[in-house]
A protein has these predicted regions:
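An almost-null, non-specific background feature
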Residues: 15, 19, 23-28, 45, ...
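Active-site-proximal alpha-helical
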Residues: 73-151
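Zinc-dependent metallopeptidase catalytic helix centered on the HExxH motif
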Residues: 1-67
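A broad "ordered helical/assembly scaffold" signature
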Residues: 17, 50, 72, 191, ...
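Beta/coil-rich, acidic/histidine-enriched accessory regions frequently appended to metallopeptidases
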Residues: 125-247
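Glutamate identity and glutamate-enriched acidic tracts
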Residues: 13, 32, 38, 45, ...
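Arginine residue identity/basic-tract feature
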Residues: 4, 23, 27-28, 53-55, ...
Length: 247
């Protein structure tokens, strides 16, 4: 109902007001790019949820948490279909889900509320803002985050110790989805380690997942490359490939 839905909206919009004050009124710079502005506003919903939960108000906290999880679920069902850095207002629900998942990951690894403050109180924007606040390159952040989205808690990796950068340190996403009665929607496409072709068209800062299975105890060498239509040279700038060996 309205009384349950509106409080997260108020927290979200209040962060936009804070952000506007910090950038436009205090620092005399333009507003933040859409994707990062929305990510920070969704992070504000999280902060209120955490404060409510600390007071024992679990039902009220869940009202804040569930909307971010619903958007995240839409994104994780097809992470190759939405851009993290989409800039067409107001942004799709899938893009908002990606943005919340990304800022949640960053805050868990790079300073929590101090990171959120640094991203808000600055003259930098977008990718430059994130890389300056974290001290990491954009490519490395995307690579680590993309692995964490699937690998953290994956049943296929039971018993495997992951590097911390491949995990969420501040939320168990799979448990949260289960708590609200939903299965974790992200799963890689299984592929046998032999000649294969994977075709897709991906927007910027999006990803697809493949799980390669090698036969026997001594798998053959793996050679991967990007190609355009009918094997023509790949023309798009900046393709990125991340490999996680699970056995």
């Amino acid at each position: 109902d309205v009384l349950r839905v509106m409080p997260p909206v108020l927290a979200h919009e209040f962060q936009h007001m804070i952000h506007f004050n910090q950038r436009f009124l205090l620092r005399r710079v333009g507003t933040e790019v859409l994707w990062l502005s929305e990510a920070l506003a969704h992070a504000a919903e999280d902060l209120v949820a955490a404060a409510l939960r600390a007071r024992g108000l679990d039902d009220e906290a869940d009202a804040f948490a569930i909307q971010n999880l619903q958007r995240a679920r839409r994104y994780l069902a097809d992470p190759g279909g939405a851009s993290l850095i989409g800039d067409d207002p107001p942004g799709s629900l899938e893009e908002r889900g990606a943005q919340w998942l990304f800022i949640k990951y960053l805050s868990g690894h790079y300073g929590g509320t101090e990171l959120l403050r640094a991203l808000t109180q600055t003259t930098l924007s977008g990718v430059n803002n994130v890389t300056a606040a974290t001290g990491r390159s954009w490519g490395s952040l995307l690579a680590d985050w993309s692995v964490a989205l699937w690998a953290d808690g994956a049943p296929e990796l039971q018993g495997v110790t992951l590097e911390p950068r491949f995990t969420y340190t501040n939320i168990d996403l799979r448990d949260e989805f289960q708590r609200f009665g939903a299965a974790y929607p992200l799963g890689p496409v299984p592929v046998l380690m032999q000649d294969f072709v994977a075709r897709d068209t991906l927007p910027a800062a999006s990803m697809d997942y493949l799980l390669l299975t090698a036969p026997g105890q001594a798998p053959p060498p793996l050679h991967l490359n990007f190609a355009g239509r009918q094997g023509t040279p790949f023309s798009e700038p900046g393709p990125q490939l991340t490999i996680l060996r699970v056995r």
